[in-house]
Amino acid sequence: MANVWGVRLADSLSSPTIETRTRQYTLHDLCSDLDANPGREPWKPLRNQRTNNIVAVQLFRPLQGLVLDTQLYGFPGAFDDWERFMREKLRVLKYEVLRIYPISNYSNEHVNVFVANALVGAFLSNQAFYDLLPLLIINDTMIGDLLGTGASLSQFFQSHGDVLEVAAGRKYLQMENYSNDDDDPPLFAKDLSDYAKAFYSDTYEVLDRFFWTHDSSAGVLVHYDKPTNGHHYLLGTLTQMVSAPPYIINATDAMLLESCLEQFSANVRARPAQPVTRLDQCYHLRWGAQYVGEDSLTYRLGVLSLLATNGYQLARPIPRQLTNRWLSSFVSQIMSDGVNETPLWPQERYVQIAYDSPSVVDGATQYGYVRKNQLRLGMRISALQSLSDTPSPVQWLPQYTIDQAAMDEGDLMVSRLTQLPLRPDYGNIWVGDALSYYVDYNRSHRVVLSSELPQLPDTYFDGDEQYGRSLFSLARKIGDRSLVKDTAVLKHAYQAIDPNTGKEYLRSRQSVAYFGASAGHSGADQPLVIEPWIQGKISGVPPPSSVRQFGYDVARGAIVDLARPFPSGDYQFVYSDVDQVVDGHDDLSISSGLVESLLSSCMHATAPGGSFVVKINFPTRPVWHYIEQKILPNITSYMLIKPFVTNNVELFFVAFGVHQHSSLTWTSGVYFFLVDHFYRYETLSTISRQLPSFGYVDDGSSVTGIETISIENPGFSNMTQAARIGISGLCANVGNARKSIAIYESHGARVLTITSRRSPASARRKSRLRYLPLIDPRSLEVQARTILPADPVLFENVSGASPHVCLTMMYNFEVSSAVYDGDVVLDLGTGPEAKILELIPATSPVTCVDIRPTAQPSGCWNVRTTFLELDYLSDGWITGVRGDIVTCMLSLGAAAAGKSMTFDAAFQQLIKVLSKSTANVVLVQVNCPTDVVRSIKGYLEIDSTNKRYRFPKFGRDEPYSDMDALEKICRTAWPNCSITWVPLSYDLRWTRLALLESTTLSSASIRIAELMYKYMPIMRIDIHGLPMEKRGNFIVGQNCSLVIPGFNAQDVFNCYFNSALAFSTEDVNAAMIPQVSAQFDATKGEWTLDMVFSDAGIYTMQALVGSNANPVSLGSFVVDSPDVDITDAWPAQLDFTIAGTDVDITVNPYYRLMTFVRIDGQWQIANPDKFQFFSSASGTLVMNVKLDIADKYLLYYIRDVQSRDVGFYIQHPLQLLNTITLPTNEDLFLSAPDMREWAVKESGNTICILNSQGFVLPQDWDVLTDTISWSPSIPTYIVPPGDYTLTPL
């Protein structure tokens, strides 16, 4: 793809090859033009492309004789008025013509076009025109008739012997609203009077002799191919100028410019069977070339005209309707730096046609064209397929050559081309609803005192931490924060079940008090959660009977100081959203006192057996101590909820069974929850403080930010080395970050802008570079279209990263955390992008292995950075390849699938290969469930029969294995290795990589990624570690043991659950698991740890050895949840009364259950008044269900609410409800299955339409006081005996 200065040409040729025959202009044609019938007018309106208003008119014969100043014609300024004026005038002129030349006699007579144009011009300017009428019909020739006396009849003509001079009449006419606006059409100086003169003769030789004796410094132009109205030369007027900012061009250049653009357009449209009026539309320079230099616009347009004639095409398509803006940009490209890269150069006296040019104009025209056999272009013949503009920047993937430059040169050129400083849009660092975490009281957990619970960070009120919280809040995309938090809290609170009754603590139609209600919510004078709550529109949250509001800022309630006693009344549920910072500010002692007062107010306002929620802004030990002493002994259960919306330590405490004495305590579950909670806060606080400030001006100094450069009129094949280095420098600055390009017009120039983002990861990769690898510009060269720019956005993904991106970020964090300065890394399945180079220290040598070729440069690195293109599961290649740490992420499953291997076989082969290496640590992501096998809808489908994972989003299918099998393979190769199943920590520490790389996170995606990690964990193998022996069943609630040989009596063992210390042998009494004991057998030299666990998950072990307490990894073990089998045993006789039917449920008591209904693919909690779980006298679990006719039309499931992910362990369909036979001899209950209209039929006859606007209750029906529909908002009716069916409408 060649460039002619700044104009880029396509890499193919195309040219018209069939020319239409010239048809003589007759009197009939002239009269038809003078009629100006709609659709056949001798003019064409031209519009402003922005406003769509008609701002100019293009004129055709016979209107091309307007040579006087426009005011002499008396034209109206508006197009509609002008068009009416023209039709009236031309109609009058037509009758004058027909009076002299009756159509019956002269219809097919040939008209002299010169005279026709002059006639119309004279008539419209109210000048004498009758003397021209005798010359209208051609007698000899158009030129011959006017030479001599004929030329004196109009100022339109002038005779010079055998040469006729004709004033070039206007081809365009401005309307009053033409302002030379950027979006107005260009008129090429042809709207000006006397912009050029045409010189006609019967032969070119006569014209040449004439110009020998006349000044031709303005440049004489010629149309060789089918010149209009005869052989002629055109002499532009130097004094007539047209604006093409920043250039002012004369009439000669304007005419050259218009003609070559017409030819370039014709080349693109050319088709083999499509005839054109003229094969070559271009003007060519016949005389005056000696007056123009190669840097002049005239000369360069002459080159472009020659190229267009030869069939070249512009790589950038010419718009159907030109604008001044586009034309200015094109002229700027013509005049930009560069050279003519084609073999064609203009000759003054003839037009060169290359031997292999598709143009046939030299055969169709006998004069002016010479085909050169020795001149060959070597290009394919094909019309360019033009593309429409792209409305936003497009991603660009750089590719590298072997060329290099100094790093300093790259930095220098980036500094010259950069668009910094600029103020980018910040975007959102987090989107979506609350990411909720919770813990509730579990009597099987170990008792914990308030003094053992984690403490609020001492630095919480420091200025930099306040800044971090503020930034996170500003950049967090959320609607009404209170609404999101309140909704999340209510959903969790309403799931709590009283283990003594099997019923939910919170049910429908309970009275509610809302403490801290505010009228300061957008669009409402009350908390936004209240209306959907009352209307039953919050999934899983039944409506209350009433909500009374209290607080400082209420509009629909009572103004009161909630921290002091007040006559509130009793409520079954009290919800307190009071902020302690209103009165307490940042004084912890005051705020703790306020919490105590609020807790007291809530206790007093809650009816016996009721529940309350209190927001705790600052969860300190004094607060926990107060709850421990005053609240826990007077409630039957509790829950702590963190609806993570913004980054703070705020929590919600939920109390159930108020005013009922108990012996509740804090538990180890609360301890683990709070450790995660505070770590999560500190993690995100640290990250937020490293991000640029909200609304910042990016000058390139922040570690995270925008990088953008712009190049004007880029021509890449001959671009300056400096510009290429600048693009390469930007690529070095941003590493693997997404790069987008825009190519557009700006102030008359064609601009390429490349935008990306820098981060600590990209800086790490740049630090590894010794030389700057130079990009291959080919992929940018081919961009002929316009790609419109957009304002840079720091966090640009409005919907947030996908679950797969979040999962990858989790793996990246673990790899980054495992490698230290100087570690030698062997990365398997690197991928073309080699992300590993951004994750490990710049001082760490690395070997990257992948079966695919790398997209990274080579030979430019500071330390050894090697890329091997091979199958890492093959034998023999690893000899001599060093790697202290081996990493393999998101690769082994695909490798196994590609080789049709089981995962066990692929893993075994990998271990076999690595056993011959020098590796000390292997970090490999494996396909292996670490929890109950459960598909993740839309993301992971698990075929447990064939042990296959299917990823629907990618259409991939991979094998998987199990933990025991993989551990066995490892220990066969390395008997003394320690194996750690790297747990996913819920403190979100992995988000550091994501946020500092400007990745927008999504709550929903994180939840899915956390689930996927359970099936695709990281396995860490410390090859030279010390193994542990597991004995017993590592199942929640059961006894199990670890035997650890090879240590001394003074060594200490620590066990971690997520981020928290679960126990230490240094003080087993402080353990956070129900039971642990540690014994050292001096004879065997081994430790035995006996344990009972209450939480399922991954636990990691670490030994502190010797007096220096050197840490040694012992690996990990997994504590499983109890068996998930569940059965439902229905009695032979079902009870259709309000007493309901008792169903025996067999399930491990570890699991808490609730009933759900699945509607339109969405899970909804079923009404607790319909399904109630309780323990029978014998201790078995019983589910009481009240039967409804609608049950046959719904899908009910029992699901566990044990984990953070509802239904993760148990999802059991209640299939009998879809097949029960309804009795016809007793009253039944009937509800609508959903909110659609349903026709109720009895014995086939329609009785009524439920949910219809005109619904009338049948006379023999009654309304049940408390609905037993799955939804508390759908009423239930008592209907008489009958055979009922329901049909949706």
From Swiss-Prot:
The alphabetical list of record keywords is: ATP-binding, Capsid protein, GTP-binding, Methyltransferase, mRNA capping, mRNA processing, Multifunctional enzyme, Nucleotide-binding, Nucleotidyltransferase, Outer capsid protein, S-adenosyl-L-methionine, Transferase, Virion
Q: Which residues cross the membrane?
A: none
Q: What is the effect of changing residue 190 to A?
A: Complete loss of autoguanylylation activity
Q: Look up keyword S-adenosyl-L-methionine and say if it applies.
A: yes
Swapping residue 89 to A leads to an effect described as:
Almost no effect on autoguanylylation activity
Source organism superkingdom? Viruses
**Family membership:** Belongs to the orthoreovirus lambda-2 protein family.
Q: What is the name attached to this protein's record?
A: Outer capsid protein lambda-2
Query: What organism does this protein naturally occur in?
Result: Reovirus type 3 (strain Dearing) (T3D)
Gene this protein is translated from: L2
